[in-house]
């Protein structure tokens, strides 16, 4: 209903606000200060004294959606990881980034959609990580143009790939093998998410499920096109295909298996 729409719009506006700080800030310390201001604003929001228009828009939903303050802080922490633009040494740090960048939003969204079974939160957590890994794989070339590498350095090492290879689109056979491993990791998270979504919450969680299915099909398309020059061709799905996935998901089709 209308309440859910308003809550989602406010949550989306919050994500845009903090995301724009990272995208627009040329100077790290200015960005950090702005993110710190948002940390304070979240404290005010949960003390019923919001000042920022976006926080004011979130305010009526704090209690009704049972929002957890820590998830908002974790989203900001994820943005700060992005702002520092450092590399992620290992899979543990990489997964932490994915959790903050996507699972925290997913958990807040799951609260908006509504659930009766706690397992739904495990589904939202794993789906968030799956979506973020898919995003990272799809955007490797685009990110490298901005000097960003999200792939854990331990994986680059495992496949004998240098940062320079990623930044300048070299050593493609090895990169294809690495992408293969990352797609398998994402696929595992999609499957784990679906396995943890209880039947009784499938209806209310449908918006997230549709998104999960669209990204899962995108991941499969990436796997099919991963032949060695993956960094050259950014994979996407047509609007028609997305619509078809959305409709069939609503009718109960299982895409993730």
Residue ranges, per PLM feature:
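Catalytic cores of Mg2+-dependent Asp-rich isoprenoid enzymes
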Residues: 1-132, 137, 141-257
